[in-house]
């Protein structure tokens, strides 16, 4: 099996020794995406905008692999404050409905002590090529 490295300028560059995603043929696994705007390097101030930016970054990577957000089968959401859970959930639901996901992906959501660049959340995803 050949592993292909996925990279797009439409998502932030890796800030460490890792890649944006790997394509295993039938699976695409993204690295965690923090809410950095790839064009400006800016991080939105509020958690809802951060959730949207992280999801858009994941989407850009998945699309570079030739898939769509509707192909995402699993996500992991890391939040700095679990009190943001409801706000993140609402934006997460909006994103997947806008992107014609047939239901919603499986998901884990965990609170963590700290994230790179002191952002409020990070999202990673697994997509399946059907």
From Swiss-Prot:
SUPFAM superfamilies: YjgF-like. One of its GO terms (molecular function) is deaminase activity. It comes from the Bacteria. GO terms for cellular component: cytosol. Pfam families: Ribonuc_L-PSP (PF01042). Homotrimer. This is RutC family protein HI_0719.
